[in-house]
Amino acid sequence: MSMMKIGFYYINELLSRIDCTQLLKGNPGISGTAYMFGLISTQLAERDNGIEVTYFAPHAVNGSPKMHVEKVNDVVEAYRKAEATGLDYLVVKNNDANLLLEKLPPPAQSQTRIVVWCHNFLNQKELNCYSRCPLVARIINVGREQMDVYRDHAAFRKSDYIYNTVQIDQRYTDGLTPVAEREDVVTYMGCVIPSKGLHVLAEAWPEVLRKKPNAQLYVIGTGALYGGNVTLGKWGLAEPRYERYIMKYLSRDGQLLPGVHLMGIMGNEKYDILTQTKVGVPNPTGNTETFCVSAVEMQMLGIRIASKRCAGYLDTVRNGVLVRNERQLADEIVRQLDADVSPDDSPTYFAQHFAPETIIGEWERLFLKTIGKDVHLHPVLPLSNPDFEYKTLKERLRRLKLRFPWLDGLLPTVNIFVDLNWKVHSFLGKLKRRLTGDQF
């Protein structure tokens, strides 16, 4: 039986500094996307599954000895090498797929097809491109709710989802202190950039302190979490203008407020803080969240979540409350701190549902059982969370377009109007900050 040949392409210089064979022990302090590319490619190569893996990158990758590593300058060179060596599929992140499809004229015939791994939400241009391009074999989302955002677009027919995998070393998950017995510790974990929302938690923090004066806030991460040449402010937290806005709420007279701790980028030592945390606040804007590894890690350690209702959290938040408005965040954090919570099965549920064995198995099924037969891993019905972002209407449009395919080019998708509403809301927020001198 011939081997299935799969390639991965993703640029992140941090992958050259870590041992990808140790990623099963947890994220060592790199971005979630880099962590997933390193972990999935390495584990697919390690297993006896009939899959041969090649990793394309402009830098070294310390992966499995069974994984081939090819040095390339960009995604176009990666695709050309993949095609020349007879790979069946090349897995790329959506922004790299965009660059590839813009620069590389689709060949008349090609053995190597593209699997677009979407760690971000897609715009209409991307959806149109992927749905029409014969080179794109599958659009893999990292969550069911992320995929459902485009339910009424033609690209949905090429779409499927495989959740990210999350693993925490057993020494941190064994013998957890019950959350009700923990002190009033709140933790934010993620990159400190505007789209990840630390400023929303910072704005809420004075109100939290008014009601819970002894509460503590830990911030794990900086604006340099994703790598690159990033200039941080004097606190080493974020880009200077954004940092100044955040610290307006978290400092006084040039000193951190009592109980505020800026921890910087952390590896597995972050779990020493998380195991003592009562309430976790991953990205409280919900913007950009297609899955949120941080939210899952927190819940695996018994932490209650307080954040905003969004697509990614509908898939991954089981132990906590998702508010509909950012102004409700402070009150919800206080409620979660005061909650008399009985132990539940959330840590066990998450450890099983997002276990590497489960998720790697999904990737193997994708390549070995479904993609070549043009079938999907998951059924499109029944609807989950039908009240979220007009999903019931999207489903009606999907069925209508299946019946009358010529409507694809005539009827706009519902998400065009959802995005427009978000852009107006975002513009008004920026305008308000500019008028009040709080622009970042």
Where are these regions (language model features)?
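Conserved donor-binding/catalytic core segment of Leloir-type glycosyltransferases
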Residues: 5-9, 140, 170, 177-209, ...
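Short hydrophobic beta-strand element within catalytic cores of glycosyltransferases
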Residues: 300-307
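A charged, aromatic-enriched C-terminal amphipathic alpha-helix characteristic of glycosyltransferases
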Residues: 32-35, 271, 338-415
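Short acidic alpha-helix that forms the nucleotide-activated donor recognition element
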Residues: 79-85, 247-252, 267-277, 300
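Nucleotide-activated donor-binding/catalytic signature segment of Leloir-type glycosyltransferases, i.e.
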Residues: 230-265
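Acidic donor-binding loop of glycosyltransferase active sites
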Residues: 274-290
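A short, active-site helix/loop in glycosyltransferases that binds the activated sugar's phosphate group
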Residues: 125-130, 134-161, 166-171
